[in-house]
């Protein structure tokens, strides 16, 4: 492997390695919630995902003739995120393929640490969702006892997305929704835990609030002004204020929206790097996400939206840099002309 590239990756690891360490450990509370809802199977799935990601890291280090270092937890954090985006009933081989796709195709093919244009966790999830939709987008109800190794006989459904798509409102109280007591990917339903994790990442300066806030605000505004619930779009805002707000609540708490806002959107190498660029980036992901949710076939369309906007995040950065230079060059030129 090129020595200059190795040195550059080591510099990047010094700069952003703490982000992946924090994400890795903050996935543990969500895993605990998943085990509370579904038993020991989420622990088995996450363990297999971690093992797969770690073995990929060691294999790539061997093939590229570099020394493996356990300081880099990016593969492990991507693997955990992919596992938490899956239903607790997913077959083990599907999860393994998703992790392999995310780590090898989403990350290593582009050069490894810090060189990838697309979020590797979103790549892994998208590959699994497109290849095995009947396993990836259908979920068991919480508190359903799951066999440890083979959960194929457990009843699963997509009732949450079916309800929202048909114009209905979730028949759940706010506390149940905040705690994640509904059929969803095993690590994405506990909103209170996810928000607490996001607060920790923010206080540790691992993430910038601009992208996440603009993403959630954009999604909320679209859900408020263009609701999917039957009859709300034709009614006035004031007469349907509470149902619209309930629709916003349902949209933001389902489809892994909060989870992606905290754990995927601010990934250091795929998110825009400047303040205004991050706000625009989050807004674009929000628009694309609601488009996928309203007109697509996957409940977790946010992962596909993220991949779509990842393709222009570098363009957003370059455009902002050019505008910044242009706006600061004009006053200096006028000053020189006046002198």
Could you describe each region identified by the protein language model?
Residues 1-61, 333-339:
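N-terminal signal-anchor module of multipass membrane proteins
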Residues 1-22, 292-339:
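Cytosolic-side transmembrane-helix boundaries in multi-pass membrane proteins
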Residues 7, 55-67, 103-114, 196-205, ...:
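C-terminal ends of transmembrane helices
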Residues 22-29, 45-57, 74-79, 83, ...:
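Alpha-helical transmembrane segments in multi-pass membrane proteins
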Residues 117-121, 249-257, 278, 296-309:
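Loop-to-transmembrane alpha-helix initiation sites
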